[in-house]
């Protein structure tokens, strides 16, 4: 604001406007140019180039260019992941980058080691090795898996099979995080011929089942200090768990794939009960971030459920969710965040985690909690149904990722995807209230590795055949 006639006062540091990626960039560019003219009396001679541009400029409707860009995006994503390894993979991988950018344009690196991020990133490396023939990535994945199935995995006693959340929350178990850490081991067993982790994965599923309610749903997490035999029995005897795709859908996907890998019918039965219960309540499930997230999270497990049972009612569940999801598709290719009634746990919060929409209709896609799951989900849906519509949805979701991947000479950004993308502005921009994972956050696991695996899965499935 102006103080007198010749002083402009700013309540925050402006000098890092470019490095800190102030957005919307068009508005900030106009404002910075105005300041320069006000100070100097003339139009500025130049404006600094953005440190990030989003996506390829190629025509992705052309099949050859699509395949070239997909291959390039996978390679860039794999290189980005390598930059966050701990001790060359022997210590796992860092979580990624937080939303926060300080006054000098420095990013906050989330350097804790999470089991889910480590397992997911190992999965991306292993798929890349399988398809490219670059064996060093398979060796790298093997080192990372020693973290997942080593110190993060309890063996023996009443907690046998419990998988730890992360290095600074040693006794916490989120079944969603466990599932995402272990699903790559199931992809490996079922589609790449390596069954070395199936026995341990079954132990982890057995532990989760021992703390799952009668309806096939688990509470959002368990803490080891609470889990006496009496408490575990109480959890099993509860009629209902938490009907949330955020917390339970990928647990069910892991159960179903573990059932196929091991032949244990119980896994399929528990997953079927849980998914059928959620679909009884759908779309009024217990939302964490948004209604869009719940739909995106359900595609993979419902596809695997139909693949496992062949039942028409399960096919109809898959199509119902996939068709509902199209109602929030944006012309740019992503899916708008939507939350009917704003009932999600983190809807429009300002003190902790927060969804990225301010109101329904915002043209914002969430690549941490929603759109990131779709390449893998649609790949499995096509595999389960043979319906070309799902193949086109897979391709559409990949094209969206190709148009939102970051290109930059800053190595901590180049090749990654950030959490939120405004599909009108065509840049990262959204409600900034989340304390750690707002628009600019980049997760090694949840986002980058999941997108990469989803991009590669059709090739894995084709190679198996």
Annotated model-derived regions:
Residues 37, 41-117, 135-168, 200-228, ...:
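Low-complexity, Ser/Thr/Pro/Gly-enriched N-terminal "stalk/linker" regions
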Residues 190, 195, 206-261, 265, ...:
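Active-site lining segments of carbohydrate-active enzymes
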Residues 1-50:
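A glycine-centered loop/beta-turn motif at secondary-structure junctions
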Residues 53-68, 119-135, 180-196, 249-264, ...:
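Well-ordered alpha-helical scaffold segments within catalytic/enzyme domains
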Residues 154-157, 337-342, 391-465:
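CBM-like carbohydrate-recognition segments
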Residues 101-118, 163-180, 188, 230-248, ...:
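Solvent-exposed loop and edge beta-strand segments that line ligand/cofactor-binding
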Residues 88-106, 266-280, 313-366, 431-444, ...:
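Extended glycan-interaction surfaces of carbohydrate-active proteins
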Residues 27-34, 50-54, 66-84, 133-151, ...:
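Extended, well-ordered alpha-helical scaffold segments
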């Amino acid at each position: 604001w102006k103080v007198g006639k010749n002083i402009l006062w700013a309540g925050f540091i402006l000098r890092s406007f470019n490095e800190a990626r102030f957005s919307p960039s068009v508005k900030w560019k106009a404002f910075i140019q105005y300041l320069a003219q006000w100070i100097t009396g003339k139009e500025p001679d130049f404006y600094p180039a953005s440190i990030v541009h989003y996506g390829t400029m190629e025509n992705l409707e052309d099949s050859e260019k699509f395949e070239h860009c997909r291959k390039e995006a996978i390679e860039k994503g794999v290189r980005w992941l390598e930059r966050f390894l701990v001790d060359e993979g022997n210590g796992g991988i860092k979580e990624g980058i937080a939303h926060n950018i300080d006054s000098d344009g420095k990013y906050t690196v989330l350097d804790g080691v999470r089991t889910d991020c480590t397992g997911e990133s190992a999965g991306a490396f292993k798929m890349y090795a399988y398809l490219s023939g670059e064996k060093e990535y398979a060796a790298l994945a093997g080192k990372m898996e020693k973290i997942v199935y080593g110190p993060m995995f309890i063996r023996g006693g009443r907690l046998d099979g419990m998988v730890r959340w992360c290095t600074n929350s040693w006794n916490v178990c989120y079944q969603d995080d466990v599932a995402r850490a272990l699903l790559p081991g199931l992809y490996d067993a079922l589609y790449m011929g390596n069954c070395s982790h199936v026995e341990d994965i079954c132990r982890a599923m057995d532990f989760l089942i021992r703390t799952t309610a009668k309806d096939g749903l688990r509470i959002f997490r368990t803490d080891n200090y609470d889990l006496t035999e009496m408490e575990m029995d109480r959890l099993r005897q509860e009629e209902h768990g938490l009907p949330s795709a955020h917390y339970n859908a990928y647990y069910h996907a892991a159960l179903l794939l573990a059932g196929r890998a091991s032949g244990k019918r119980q896994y399929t039965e528990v997953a079927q009960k849980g998914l059928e219960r959620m679909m009884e309540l759908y779309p009024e499930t217990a939302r964490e971030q948004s209604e869009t997230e719940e739909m995106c999270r359900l595609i993979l497990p419902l596809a695997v459920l139909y693949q496992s049972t062949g039942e028409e009612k399960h096919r109809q569940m898959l199509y119902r969710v996939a068709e509902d999801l199209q109602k929030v598709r944006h012309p740019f290719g992503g899916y708008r965040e939507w939350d009917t009634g704003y009932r999600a746990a983190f809807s429009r919060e300002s003190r902790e985690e927060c969804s990225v929409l301010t109101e329904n209709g915002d043209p914002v896609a969430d690549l941490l909690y929603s759109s990131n799951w779709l390449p893998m989900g649609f790949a499995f849906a096509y595999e389960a149904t043979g319906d070309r519509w799902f193949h086109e949805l897979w391709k559409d979701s990949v094209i969206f990722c190709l148009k939102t991947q970051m290109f930059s000479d800053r190595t901590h950004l180049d090749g990654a995807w950030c959490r939120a993308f405004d599909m009108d502005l065509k840049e990262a921009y959204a409600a900034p209230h989340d304390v750690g994972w707002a628009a600019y956050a980049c997760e090694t696991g949840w986002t980058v590795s999941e997108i990469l695996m989803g991009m590669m899965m059709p090739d894995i499935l084709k190679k198996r055949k």
